[in-house]
Amino acid sequence: MDQSRVLLWVKAEPFIVGALQIPPPSKFSLHYLRKISTYVRTRTIEGGYPRLSWSTWRHIACGKLQLAKDLAWLYFEMFDSLAMKTPEERLEWSEILSNCMSEDEVEKQRNQLSVDTLQFLLFLHIQQLNKVSLRTSLIGEEWPSPRHRAQSPDLTEKSSCHNKNWNDYSHQAFVCDHLSDLLELLLDPEQLTASFHSTHSSLVSREAVVALSFLIEGTVSGARKIYPLYELALWHPLHAETGFSKASKTFSFYKLEAWLRTCLTGNPFGTSACLKSGKKLAWAHQVEGTTKRAKIACNTHVAPRMHRMVVMSQVYKQTLAKSSDTLVGAHVKIHRCNESFIYLLSPLRSVTIEKCRNSTFVLGPVQTALHLHSCDNVKVIAVCHRLSISSTTGCIFHILTPTRPLILSGNQRVTFAPFHTHYPMLEDHMARTGLATVPNYWDNPMIVCRENSSPSVFRLLPPCEFYVFIIPFEMEGDTTEIPGGLPSAYQKALSQRKKKIQVWQKTVKEARLTKDQRKQFQVLVENKFYEWLINTGHRQQLDSLVPPAAGSKQAAG
């Protein structure tokens, strides 16, 4: 590193993947987090600090914060899923859980887990990102509210970033607005007043700055390498600015805070930068008779691993199918795509599907979180670490997941069904993302929102309505069947249906129809099949598989 200017920014992933899209529990307020921060430091032997064990967090969350055990585990496991672990480590954990024969055995294994205490406190604090502010609600909109007006379709407009989890302006504003609180949360108790505030002489430990690297990273202007915050803060030429003392191995609270505020800038790998200066991808074609043009942008040509991003909007009335290096390990946002069939058959880091209608999404394994918001009549087929849904209507989820699907607020007529497809590289992609076939909690969703805890918000697909899904593309690879197979009830339904078809074929064969009768029968069957294609929407899917005219073909990734 030379003496050039330091640039810092707020990392996107903790917010995209780590901030649950609901208002946090009231006990996650700063007041309680400060109390937890002090409490855990008195429990070093019991697993409170510097690593927080699941058993200690369960005691705090359930005993002191009055959270349900399932909710306490949800936040603990969400944070743990952000940790840098190899796919092999994740697969090993799945194997351990799949061998457990009871809830007590599962709990015994969970008790072996621990997370970084200070980073976990920061993680709990950023849940405030989606806190509903009455004041903001009152002053933030015109009255009457112009909700009936169509939103701007332009991807580059801020209107496309209503989801705070994907809005890097919101990430930066949150950290800047709460920077003092974040630093105070990391202070040793003796550095705080009785009211849990810093003083002019408060000192910040190196461990605290290492923890803050969970949210902030940076570089030196003119360099390509990205450094965690603590490496830059400890860089010798910056000691005067950051307030680091070699003698005490601590930072001056106020000098460090001032330096952070001076250096914080926009995320060069965030959504805004991707939309403004990212590479435009010609993956979709213009549909005749439509005015909206599909927009797909990525930053994978400049972004390091873990910072890759693909944003796709306004894909309309077509089939889009990709297996591309551009998608591998990327955070993907799919926005306002309607009446389409979208196949993204690569290992993905996270996926957010927002404001889409009447579409089918077939995804490669999603290593962290798959989230749907404000979607209508959408079918999603995926292997994912976690699924969460909010404000959806009439959506079907064919999933394989090692965690309970999260039903957040505003959902209606949700259907869960077993994962029912495969493509040749699927098992290889699952291994690369650390996702196994067991345990699989597709049929055990968790209703997280308070507004509607009724189980009637969702149903499990009846076996009589179940069909397998065929991916109509040729690829290289070894997977030839659905990973993990199908639940017995669904396999039985398929077998019974197959038997009925065989009986019907035998009946037709033995009917000894004349040549004219066979022709009439063939026409009748074809007409009925054509009606079925139209009524089920499969006709549109077949039509969209026909390659577009030359000049508007999908480009390679």
Swiss-Prot record:
Q: Where is the C-CAP/cofactor C-like domain?
A: 290-435
Compartment(s) of residence: Cytoplasm, Cytoskeleton, Microtubule organizing center, Centrosome; Cytoplasm, Cytoskeleton, Spindle pole
Entry protein name: TBCC domain-containing protein 1
Gene3D superfamilies assigned: 2.160.20.70
Query: Which family is this sequence assigned to?
Result: Belongs to the TBCC family.
The protein's role, per its UniProt record? Plays a role in the regulation of centrosome and Golgi apparatus positioning, with consequences on cell shape and cell migration.
Note the coiled coil stretches, chain numbering.
none
Q: Which gene encodes it?
A: TBCCD1
Any single biological process term in GO: maintenance of Golgi location
